[in-house]
Amino acid sequence: MKRNAADAVFSNLVRTRAKWTCECCGSWHGDSKASLHCSHHISRRFNATRLDSRNAAAHCASCHRKFTDDPVMHGEWIEAKIGKETYLELRAAANRTCQIKKHEWKEIVKTLKWQLKQMNEGRSEEFIGWRG
């Protein structure tokens, strides 16, 4: 699936929230940002959850691959990280049809960029409307 501008900013938000550290193994990737991935718990092909901050974590390439290869381990990690109830909410939301029009994507990108700027300036996640 092709990434768009919103995906790129969302990825930076997720990795910034994690302070450029893998949320699984704890390795730091501030000097090599490409090696830290924005890993979606539920596929980003579902627009309803694609940009939901609860649906993504920062994982190094090794941990991301490990979770891709072992979905059971990944599911257990997700439940430990965000809780079973939140995970079930995300799964239910992913099943809802959600179409985003071109002009809406532009507004989404604008909001995400504002949130990233605020996060980089040290604002709290609650202040910027970012759920973790």
Model features per residue range: what roles?
Residues 9-10, 41, 60:
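Extended interaction regions within the primary functional domain
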Residues 44-47, 62-65, 96:
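General structural signal for alpha-helix termini and helix-helix connectors
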Residues 2, 6, 48, 66:
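Conserved aromatic-histidine-acidic binding/catalytic patches
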Residues 23-57:
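Histidine-centered nuclease catalytic patch
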Residues 69-132:
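A detector for short metal-coordination/catalytic motifs
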Residues 27-30, 56-83:
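Short Cys/His-centered divalent metal-binding micro-motifs
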Residues 1-21, 98-99:
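Short, charged surface segments at domain edges that flank catalytic/cofactor-binding sites
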